[in-house]
Each structure stands twice: as structure tokens, then as C-alpha cells.
A protein has these predicted regions:
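Conserved alpha/beta-hydrolase "acid-adjacent" motif
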Residues: 274-280
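Short beta-strand element of the alpha/beta-hydrolase
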Residues: 111-121
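Catalytic nucleophile-loop/oxyanion-hole region of alpha/beta-hydrolase
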Residues: 127-135, 145-186, 310-317
């Protein structure tokens, strides 16, 4: 019976991921990445209008807030990233499910630096395809191997934040232990993540002698972020050890900054983010600088949580800013 229950939990998690991905590809947004829905009168309205109002986010000066946005490639054409060899590797098995590394291989005469990419999804949905284009772009254009990591999600059997963080560290360890066959330099790597993935990427970067961290709309102080500290979601509460303050502090990147060899940080956020406060990125940037590290903070006024996605007109700007930052620091 336990085996069947575990299988059922895994199927539910996979279905949630599939539904979330589908919704993400069909959701209307304006160019600020705010979600739109039809208003029944031939126009549009903000899906979360009441939430913006409650958060006192003034829309009065945004004349284009109800105009749908559709991404059209400008600088980022498919020829820049298509054709990269990708291999899927099972790096870990746990509680009846497999965890996968999707490795986008750089073509290089010498062992390549590599990036670890961690997807968002509130620690409970989505998959490791979210950074595929950036990973393959850097593999093809910059000789940087990309490692897109799947990790234990909150609905899966035995899931806790500590288990998920261990997955991240085990993924890194797997790549380093197999550096020769993957043709990578085990000492030259960085982390990138979005939202919950930015939290995990930051933990991984601070604990591992990483060269750099790129975080989009990330959670870095879990004792202050509303998505954790004020959550009413029973599954998330259990995942975070019943919101035990010691646990939240122990897994907060702002408390994990090393005394030396601090990873260079590029932190991106939008001031109208309803999911994660932009202040989270500001706090980590300040903390890194106070310890003598490098932190580049890119704040986008009026932009919502998914400003780094194709639902935002800043997607390509953030994409190439990230690519340049990664190439500069992975030396």
C-alpha cells in the first residue's frame, strides 16, 4: 500500500507540473508580466487587481497596464542556441522516483566551466526545462556547459526543504565526481535560479565555493518573506518544518554568506511583485556587499514576479545581462 501511495503522490506532482507549465504558456500578460483576463466587454482586466490594490501598488500612471503583450524575438533568435547536445542523467533515486540532470554540453577543447540551473514553482511544481534556452545559448556561444536540475518537490514522498537542498548539493557533487566524462572543470561553476529556484541556487552557491549566483525574483530571508513566513498552505508549512524559526533561518541564504570567496551576485526583481517582495533581493545584495562581496542589483519598477520570462518585455534584456555576467565571472 505504501508503494502505491508513493506512486500516487508522484503522479499528482507530475500532473501539477504539467498543468502549471500549460497555464504558464497560455496566460495573458501585459508587458510588466502582470496577468490579464478578459473583462467580458471586449477588453481586459488584471487577474489580481484586488491584490495589487491591497498591496498599495498604484496603477494610475501606467496607461498600458491593460494591453496584452506577446513576446516576439528580437536579438534572441533560435540559431543562437539550437543544435546543442543534451543528455539526461539520473543522478539520484529516492522514495520511488528519479531525479534528473539535463546536461547541455559545451563544445570545448578544454574542460568547460558549468552552470547549475534550478527552476521555480514554489518548491512544489514545474520542471527543469525553464532555463533551457539560456543554458543552451551559453553552451553554444560561450563554451559553458549547462546542468538543469530536477529536485524533490513538496508533494513528493518524504519531501522537506532540507531534502531538496541536499538534492541540489548532490547534483553538484555528481557533476564534480563525473567531471572527466562530462568534460567540465569541477572547480569553475555557478548557480542560477528563479523564485524558489533562486532560493535553492543561492543556498547552493553560498555553500559550495561557487564563482557566481544569478537570482530572479528570489527568496533569500525565509523568516521575512511572506511566501514562507506568512504562508497558510498546509503542504508548504509541513515542507518547512512547521515554519520552525530555526529551520527558516538555517535555510536562508542571507545567513549563509561565506567569510571569503563570496560568489559574485546578480539579483533581479520587480517592484510590483505580488509573490516575492523585491526587498528580498535588496537585502541579499546589501548583505553580500557588507561582507566585501560583489552584488549587482537590477530593480525593475512596476514589474511583477515573472519579469525574466517571455511574459515580460524585459526578458531579452535580463537574458543577455545574465549571459554577460556569467561569462565575466566564470573564468
Amino acid at each position: 500500500m505504501k508503494k502505491y501511495l508513493s506512486l500516487l503522490c508522484l503522479v499528482c506532482a507530475m500532473l501539477g507540473t504539467a498543468i502549471g507549465v500549460k497555464a504558464q504558456t497560455t496566460q495573458l500578460t501585459n508587458h510588466y508580466a502582470m496577468k490579464l483576463i478578459e473583462d467580458g466587454q471586449g477588453g481586459y482586466k488584471l487577474l489580481q487587481e484586488a491584490h495589487y490594490a491591497k498591496a498599495r501598488m498604484d496603477m494610475s500612471k501606467l496607461t498600458d497596464v491593460l494591453v496584452p503583450y506577446k513576446y516576439e524575438p528580437q536579438r534572441l533568435t533560435s540559431k543562437l542556441y539550437k543544435g546543442v547536445e543534451t543528455v539526461d542523467i539520473v543522478y539520484k533515486k529516492a522514495n520511488g522516483y528519479e531525479l534528473i540532470l539535463s546536461v547541455d554540453k559545451a563544445v570545448s577543447d578544454k574542460p568547460a566551466p558549468f552552470m547549475i540551473y534550478l527552476h521555480g514553482g514554489g518548491w512544489r511544481t514545474s520542471n527543469n526545462g525553464s532555463s533551457k534556452i539560456l543554458s543552451q545559448y551559453l553552451a553554444k556561444q560561450a563554451g559553458i556547459t549547462g546542468v538543469r536540475v530536477s529536485y524533490t518537490l513538496a508533494p513528493q514522498p518524504g519531501a522537506t526543504i532540507q531534502v531538496t537542498i541536499q538534492d541540489v548539493m548532490d547534483a553538484l557533487k555528481y557533476v564534480q565526481n563525473h567531471a572527466k566524462e562530462l568534460h567540465v572543470d569541477p572547480s569553475c561553476f555557478g548557480f542560477l535560479g528563479m523564485s524558489a529556484g533562486a532560493h535553492l541556487a543561492a543556498v547552493g552557491a553560498m555553500k559550495s565555493q561557487a564563482k557566481l549566483l544569478v537570482g530572479y525574483s528570489g527568496i533569500y530571508d525565509l523568516q521575512k518573506a511572506k511566501i514562507t513566513a506568512k504562508t497558510k498552505d498546509a503542504q508548504r508549512i509541513a515542507y518547512f518544518d512547521q515554519l520552525n524559526p530555526k529551520t527558516l533561518a538555517a535555510v536562508s541564504p542571507i545567513n549563509l554568506i561565506p567569510q571569503k570567496n563570496i560568489p559574485a551576485c546578480l539579483l533581479v526583481c520587480g517592484t510590483y511583485d505580488l509573490t516575492v517582495e523585491c526587498e528580498q533581493s535588496k537585502m541579499l545584495a546589501d548583505a553580500v556587499k557588507q561582507k566585501g562581496g560583489e552584488a549587482v542589483l537590477s530593480v525593475y519598477p512596476f514589474y511583477d514576479h515573472n519579469l525574466s520570462s517571455k511574459g515580460s518585455d524585459k526578458m531579452e534584456e535580463i537574458f543577455f545581462k545574465s549571459a554577460d555576467f556569467i561569462q565575466k565571472n566564470l573564468k
